[in-house]
Amino acid sequence: MSEQRGTIRRVFHWSWNQRHRFLQFGMVGVTGIALNQIVIWLCQEHLYTAIGDLSLRLNLAMATGILIGMTNNFHWNRKWTWKDRYRAEHTPLLKQYIQYCTANWAGILIQVALTNLLVLWMPYLVANLVGIGFASLANFTLNDLWTYRHVRTEGIDPEGAQLERARLALPLLLCGLVLSLCVYIVGLGSLHILSNGDELVYMQITRATAASGHWLPLASEDPAMVNTKPPLLFWQGILSTDWGTHWSLLALRWPSIVWTFATALMTGMLAWRLGGRDILRGVLAALFFLAFFSTFRYGRPFLTNPPETFWVFSCFSVMLWWSPGSFASRLAVPTVLGLLAGCALLTKSFAQLVPILAGLSLWHLSMRGWRWREFATRALPGLLWTSVLALGIFALWFAFDPKPAAIWRHFVVGENVGKMAGGIGSWFEGFLFSGDSVWTLALSWFLNAGLLAFPLFGVAVESWKHRREATREERLLWWWVLAIFLVFCIPAQRSGRYLLEAMPALAVLMALRWHHVGRNAFVLTHVGVLAVLVPIAWLSVTLAREIGIAWFSWWHWPFLAGAMAFAALSIAKPRWTAMCAAPAAMSVYLALTSFLAVFDAPGGAFDERTVAALKGKTLWVPENFRSVAELHRFLLPDTTIRGFASSLDAPPVKSTSVGEYYIVTEPLSSRAPEGAIGCRGQITSRHSPQQIWEMATGRISEHLFCREWIVPVSAPK
């Protein structure tokens, strides 16, 4: 505790030199403001007059002014304010400039958030001045502790290379792991968790199949979606809901987090074994995996990704756990791999066998010194047996389904072969230049890591630099990452979701190499945490002003403040920076869950009177994606739900009859439509570029929040 107080005192109890430095910092800031104003005037009145759009001209002028003003401030702070610091002269200029700009933008976010919060209780000009004051303090502190800090540190701990031996390391990580488990459980039954539109389709198929009373064939209200995936996921949903008798989001989703936690446990155990039975590395690997954005987004909903990731990574964990004996086995291990791979195929697709075989083949070749003849005689027969066994398990679907031709038509041809559709020319064009290009797929590694993208990039760079010193197991894990990437470059449709099976391997690599990565990578994670938490706080204040603070949980506001303080303290205290990166990322997920919980009951649900009025009735719900109306079955379980295109103002007249109802979406501030019998708060999705631009310029509540009103089909909108 005394050490923690000492850190806070060093940050905020400034000596005379620091006060003088802050005065210099302020004087430089004044010159930057003056230069910013001059540049904006010159651009607006003279340089950019050829731009007819006044709004675009002003924004370009402001961007130019900010860039030049920030560059001016960076130069003089480097040459004058912090000229006594070693880093001011010996750090690469571009690297230091990026750090300075990042610190400035963090200050801007703090100013905007504080101004929007304080304007509830004081005049906006006074609130803005207070926001500027706190932002200046934050900006100065970040630059003093990070951009121009006293010591240059290449490792995590500036006081020593063995940070993992710090007394608080393991307790902090264990607390972070407990926090992660809680984050995954909280809000699991919410309508508004981060998910994917496929979840609604899978729910609809599960419900229809359960209603049919048969395991096979699969059923759906949309004939084109009947066999979109193998049956294992839908059988899981049937069992967890007891054939639909306990139909709820929580009942459908809880098996997903069981799969995700099992994968995290397997990841931690593997890192523990490969790291010399070091429990710190094991806990860290599990924590990294759970803190990846892709794990949080796809590891909780009712999707194929949680079980698929478990089964696929199990194949490679088995090989590493019993290495090198597993590579010499010709029957036992290939049989186990065939069973595991078969479960993966029956969860997602027979095509999943390709990356599994590619990864295992590269592993066998690497272990045999790339001797192809030895690979063909000793490893290939086992791989062929694994393939036959896995495909045999997948073929059970065809064997037991009474309509195998429909499976071939919808799943094999439509769902899988269709992704390779198109000629060679169009494939190459998409490979290099489309939104699904190979470059986008490569970037997906870091998008999947989310706020841990910076440490992941650092691990990749360090691993490449020291590739000759890498252990055999590290090389194998990198071969698996490369294999799955190369395989999924082939389909015309490329998505970061296809790479999820390799994210546990990256978590293990990060746990093994984290102490080789510079502290700056983890500092950037904490800056990113602040950059996300501040907008969440801003949106929370904006929504509270519209609908009232009572809609929020009592712990929402103190948790936001605590999470931001935790990230700032982790930056200020070098020994905490790396260890607290994953828990800080998890705090962002919990803050987002708390914010989205506003749109659950009671604010995001229809009241009891509305639910009773719609019992036995038909409600038409606008859909901008397939099966979106499925969510309203959880809100109105005794109502017949039907969907219509969201591009229409109302359901088609020919499809409706008197006594039916439909949903009208209006802004929060709009009055109730005539004849409305109830409403609920909602958050919108799938915004146009124009709407995104308008939200970025301040019109948030108009486009991000809305109300769903239920009106009779005979009532005018």
Predicted feature locations:
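Transmembrane-helix motifs of polytopic, lipid-linked glycan transferases
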Residues: W254-G276, S314
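Transmembrane-helix signature of polytopic, membrane-embedded enzymes
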Residues: V126, G176, T267-A291
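Start-transfer (signal-anchor) and selected internal transmembrane alpha helices
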Residues: F12-W14, I156-Y184, W272, M367-G369, ...
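Short acidic/glycine- and proline-prone juxtamembrane loop motifs at membrane-interface regions
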Residues: L249-R253, R297-E308, S349, S495
